[in-house]
Swiss-Prot record:
CDD domains with a match to the protein in the record: PPase_ThiI, RHOD, THUMP_ThiI
Domain of life of the native organism: Bacteria
Molecular function GO terms recorded: ATP binding; CCA tRNA nucleotidyltransferase activity; tRNA binding; tRNA-uracil-4 sulfurtransferase activity
Residues given in the record as ATP binding sites: 183-184, 265, 287, 296
Function: Catalyzes the ATP-dependent transfer of a sulfur to tRNA to produce 4-thiouridine in position 8 of tRNAs, which functions as a near-UV photosensor. Also catalyzes the transfer of sulfur to the sulfur carrier protein ThiS, forming ThiS-thiocarboxylate. This is a step in the synthesis of thiazole, in the thiamine biosynthesis pathway. The sulfur is donated as persulfide by IscS.
Gene Ontology, cellular component aspect: cytosol
The protein, known as: tRNA sulfurtransferase
Length: 482
């Protein structure tokens, strides 16, 4: 088994010292991943290409996966290598391997040569091509757009016949650019934006603001680990989880409805900037796209950016949602994003699309910033490699009911605004109103001899809150889905 790995062309327009550094990093990245996934596969840096070889094909599939999923590789040539005696011997070997392939088709021969020989690359192409044309009567030479291109490479006394060309990711080798912190939610956008910066050579760490309990966190850990394992596993990166429910509760209690969305995003950026500074990370990356939601207008994005000195990168800023979903499908994150929970949480009824600086600052003056500082202090930090076992877990299920049993109590956990807009009324049933952001502190004060059915509009937040309560030892909770 042998592959000739061609680095991305952008690497070769750089200075000699930078080119050497980039290709050395690429060589190291390939070797690091292959050593973890295979045995007895060697990696050699040959100045303008990298060779990956093994005496057997045992790890062919694993090796090919690594070469097509590692940033910095333009393409990899799968080759059959042999020794040759002279020009005619090259022709004989090419005829043996490619003669049957060109029968009844048009073809051309393309050759590359390294080392000292008594023939040029063009002479090699003409000799082999002419010989094939005479030996295979049904084949015809066609130099432009042929059915088959027979590719050969000669290096000193070795002949490499190209079996197949495998497209790589492109971009720069991982670690050639500075580290980034992805504010990942597990949806389509944040997964794609993280991938784009991995591809461009940055080690991407992941910061997750948890608004929905353990089920959401498990899902986001899974997609983060997937991105790292498939495209960036040559690097050690961190996964940081921050329980943002106290921040949401503070916003819902103190901030005017129309400003909630922008204020929440400003809190995300403040927190992200503080985490980035703690770990010496230069920039944040988000999946925001211009105009996709009310907080993503130019005016609102400017106000969001102003709360931190950390650079904020938005690689999807001018992308259509359809294009984002298409790329997520291609890179394998679509299935994660499709099942990622959505929330009944901080949704302004009339969100501002053009926030005013003075108004935002006045609303944030009501916010207790000690809450934000505390959740950052309590952030859970882990090596993403430790997620592997957890990534196999599935969020536990909680029982859902359509009818209310006798003596059961329905807990409406929607925000006060949602409750006012669409009151829940059920004849003969006791209904209590406890917003989800107060449930963890107030549920223990209820009569625990009763059964409680949690309700919200979509049934997602109620399920997540029920799971959380069960984790705390309360087993008298179910989800009400009429």
């Amino acid at each position: 088994m042998k592959f000739i790995v061609k680095p991305h062309p952008e690497i070769f327009v750089k200075s000699e010292s930078v080119r050497k550094r980039f290709t050395k990093i690429l060589e190291r990245n390939i070797r690091t991943i292959l050593q973890r996934r295979t045995e007895s596969v060697a990696v050699f840096n040959r100045r303008d290409h990298i060779e990956v070889t093994s005496e057997s094909d045992k790890y062919f599939k694993e090796t090919l996966e690594v070469l097509t999923q590692t940033p910095g590789i333009h393409h990899s040539l799968e080759v059959q290598q042999s020794e040759f005696k002279d020009l005619h011997n090259i022709y004989e070997q090419v005829l043996e391997r490619s003669g049957a392939l060109i029968e009844g088709k048009t073809f051309s021969v393309r050759a590359k040569r390294r080392g000292k020989h008594d023939f040029t690359s063009i002479e090699l192409e003409r000799y082999v091509g002419g010989g094939l044309n005479q030996a295979v009567e049904s084949a015809k030479v066609k130099l432009k757009n042929p059915d088959i291109t027979v590719k050969v490479e000669v290096e000193n006394d070795k002949l490499n016949q190209v079996i197949e060309r495998h497209k790589g990711l492109g971009g720069f080798p991982l670690g050639t650019q500075e580290d980034l912190l992805s504010l990942i939610s597990g949806g389509f956008d944040s997964g794609v934006s993280s991938y784009l910066h991995i591809k461009r050579g940055s080690k991407v760490h992941y910061c997750f603001f948890n608004l929905g309990g353990p089920a959401h966190e498990i899902g986001v850990k899974q997609v983060s680990h997937y991105l790292w394992d498939k495209y960036g596993s040559s690097a050690k990166v961190k996964f940081i989880s921050i329980d943002f429910e106290p921040v949401v509760a503070e916003i819902l209690e103190n901030v005017e409805d129309g400003q909630m969305g922008v204020v929440l995003k400003r809190m995300f950026m403040r927190a992200g900037g503080m985490v980035a500074e703690r770990f010496g990370i230069e920039a944040l990356v988000t999946g925001e796209a211009l105009g996709q939601v009310s907080s993503q207008t130019l005016t609102n994005l400017r106000h969001i950016d102003n709360v931190t000195d950390t650079l904020i990168l938005r690689p999807l800023i001018n992308w259509d949602k359809e294009d984002i979903i298409d790329l997520s499908r291609k890179i394998g994150t679509e299935d994660f994003a499709k099942v990622m929970p959505e929330y009944c949480g901080v949704i302004s009824k009339k969100p501002t699309v053009k926030a005013k600086k003075g108004k935002l600052e006045a609303e944030e003056a009501k916010f207790n910033f000690e809450v934000l500082e505390q959740v950052i202090e309590n952030a859970r930090i882990m090596d993403i490699r430790d997620i592997e076992k957890e990534s196999q877990e599935q969020a536990p299920e909680v029982e859902q009911v359509q009818a209310v049993a006798e003596h059961a109590v329905v807990l409406d956990i929607r925000s006060p605004d949602e409750e006012d807009e669409s009151p829940l009324e059920i004849d003969g049933v006791e209904i209590k109103h406890i917003p989800f952001f107060k449930l963890s502190t107030q549920f223990g004060d209820l009569d625990q001899s009763k059964e409680y059915l949690l309700y919200c509009d979509r049934g997602v937040m109620s399920r997540l809150q029920a799971l959380y309560l069960q984790e705390q030892g309360f087993h008298n909770v179910k989800v009400y889905r009429p």
